[in-house]
Amino acid sequence: MDRDTFAARIDHTVLGPETAPGDVEAVLDAAAEYGMNACVPPCYVEAASDYAPDVTLVSVCGFPHGQHATETKATEAETVWQAGADEIDVVINVGRLRGGDTDAVRAEIEQVVAAVPVPVKVIVEAPLLSASELRTACELAADADAAYLKTATGFNGDATVAAVETMAEYLPVKASGGIGSFEAAVEMFDAGADRIGASAGAAIVDGFDPAAFET
């Protein structure tokens, strides 16, 4: 893998509650410079699309807890797509999953996927799930025609190799949460991840070493 290909698999992310317009612009500037994607809060998508039209723009819905009403998530997804998002990361309702209401979880993902003509990544919040719950979440997302699985929001724990390995059995995986270095990113790619979400995107790409991908 060369540096450009590597950078294109990084979603440079700014999603904290304190995020200001200047923070978003800084992420977009870095994404444009390094050839990364950018993941920004829904309220900034339209401005971000205008500011950096050549950057692949990712946003979120139902973030970060996943407890919005299903209709609210679907509407939010449609709204951010219309504002310019190229991809959408949606948080599942972890409580419903853990409570055994799998039909509701599947139906919700289906409704969000149907609401937009762009790839939807399903955030399963793996740090909060047992091994069996994680597999159930992956199965539901695959059944609902999601494009990707995403490990976590980063608010409740970090991505792990074990979770990525499991998730990669079902769909392409975006690893997110606690990935702050090139070495950590390589570990996730080696585990089966296809994308990385990280606030340290620029630092990760700065550390690129092609030898890490030589076989």
From Swiss-Prot:
Catalytic residue positions: 89 (proton donor/acceptor), 150 (schiff-base intermediate with acetaldehyde), 174 (proton donor/acceptor)
Question: What is this enzyme's catalytic activity, as reactions?
Answer: 2-deoxy-D-ribose 5-phosphate = D-glyceraldehyde 3-phosphate + acetaldehyde
Keyword terms, alphabetized: Cytoplasm, Lyase, Schiff base
Q: Which InterPro entries match?
A: Aldolase_TIM, DeoC, DeoC/FbaB/LacD_aldolase, DeoC_typeI
Pathway it works in: Carbohydrate degradation; 2-deoxy-D-ribose 1-phosphate degradation; D-glyceraldehyde 3-phosphate and acetaldehyde from 2-deoxy-alpha-D-ribose 1-phosphate: step 2/2
Entry GO terms, CC? cytoplasm
Name the enzyme group at the top EC level.
lyase
Say yes or no: keyword Cytoplasm present.
yes
Gene3D superfamilies, alphabetically? Aldolase class I
The keyword Kinase is assigned to this record: no
Query: One GO BP annotation here?
Result: carbohydrate catabolic process
Q: Organism's domain of life?
A: Archaea
User: E.C. number, please?
Assistant: 4.1.2.4
Localization, UniProt: Cytoplasm
* A GO molecular-function annotation: deoxyribose-phosphate aldolase activity
- Pfam families associated with the record: DeoC
Principal place of residence: cytoplasm
Q: Which family does it belong to?
A: Belongs to the DeoC/FbaB aldolase family. DeoC type 1 subfamily.
Briefly, what is this protein's role? Catalyzes a reversible aldol reaction between acetaldehyde and D-glyceraldehyde 3-phosphate to generate 2-deoxy-D-ribose 5-phosphate.
| Protein name as it appears in the record | Deoxyribose-phosphate aldolase
